[in-house]
Amino acid sequence: ADMLLSLHVDGAASPLANGLASYHYGAGESSSTIGERLADLAQRELVARTGMLNGRVHPKSWALLRLTRMPAVQVEVGYLTSPLDRARLVDPAFRDTIAEGLLVAVQRLYLPKAEDPPTGVMRLPAIVA
């Protein structure tokens, strides 16, 4: 495998907690620059496509991110404890939107800067064709 993209749903004591957040390896002086770029692209694509609250990108030293020998990103795609996020997550069309956003983020990671389209405009048929 060339990269690891781990999808999670979060939970919180408050039903008001909601939104998306992405994580890459980073601790002190050490970090994954490719993981950080992928996390940033994923976060921007998902927020642009879903309109969900932007929980931003964060460096973490979690084992999943630290011990993986390839760029690794963990994306929290919402909170099951949030009625708003939960309603979105049970909708197959919303899950398709998440999948498309993540696929576009991976595609954009490998595009030369001159060919990189603006966030939120590249669509799945253009990638698959």
Language model feature labels by segment:
Residues 1-129:
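Active-site-proximal helix/loop segments of hydrolytic enzymes
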